[in-house]
Amino acid sequence: MKKIMLVFGTRPEAIKMCPLVNELKTRKGIETIVCVTGKHRQMLDQVLEAFQVEPDYDLSIMKDRQTLFDVTTNILNRIKAVLEEVQPDVVLVHGDTSTTFVTALACFYLQIPVGHVEAGLRTYNIYSPYPEEFNRQAVSIISAYNFAPTELSKENLLREGKNPDTIYVTGNTAIDALKTTVREDYTHPDLEWAKGSRLIMITAHRRENLGEPMKHMFRAIRRVCDEHPDIKAIYPIHMNPVVREIADSILGDDERIRIIEPLDVLDFHNFLSRSYLILTDSGGIQEEAPSLGKPVLVMRDTTERPEGIKAGTLKLVGTDEEVIYQNFKQLLEDEEAYRAMSTASNPYGDGFACKRIADILEGKA
């Protein structure tokens, strides 16, 4: 029996790893162990419940206003005992979080093979996104299995000198998750509030956007909403108190913008599927929305997902207020521009990434 341990801590990681947990649990020759760090406790629990995943270990590192130093040292100090107790054959981590980096580092110290899900994404600017770009590059040095979501991600890894025999193009597990969560008969009170209007979904939380960039983003969104009475915007706000303070000060009193608590993954994916367009600084939404045929304006200066830009499903608009305003306004007023983005092809997979990863691990772990 092969022991495969999956470690994750944030909501976006959980959305992409829980389908893989459930796929691995169907394999008779694999013992699946789940460890969560609890970095975003409330938001993480929502996803675990939606996918009916019960962690075997919980490091419970969550505390208010913790720094990267706190997160790094807490995970490193606590994951060691779990790894030594479980003695897994392979540890799977996802993407670019601090949990991913620190877990991979601990595995390196203990000489445990690491499988990197969503490997090979790059901006090649270690401060954008921060600290994610450094995290994922560092994990690629350590990883024995590199599960790249696209051919471009594979090419990035090859350019960096990774052994081709360790790289597998699987598609993105985010697309697998949508098969479970999006439902035709879904209803929600906030969707009833937006009924009859074009629904705009907003997400914004990135560390590098805190402060003035986020203020610019929210001012642009408010201007457009105030000028277009036929739209309503919903913003499931992040738990970060700094984000909440900025959002409340700029968007809080606008009758066409509803700030709500974080949605669980089932709710969130169904909100996305019923939206007209999406403004975000998230990484995962850049993959999920194109699968649903929704245009995405990416409020970041860089993206590690250029496939979506190239395909035309995403547009990188940065954090400048006027640029966001003009692009948001165009998609509301220019039907051809909207149609071009909403009908572009999805470059992120077919919904069978988890099966491919499990097949590889079953044969090679």
Model features per residue range: what roles?
Residues 1-235, 240-365:
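Nucleotide-activated sugar donor-binding and catalytic core shared by glycosyltransferases
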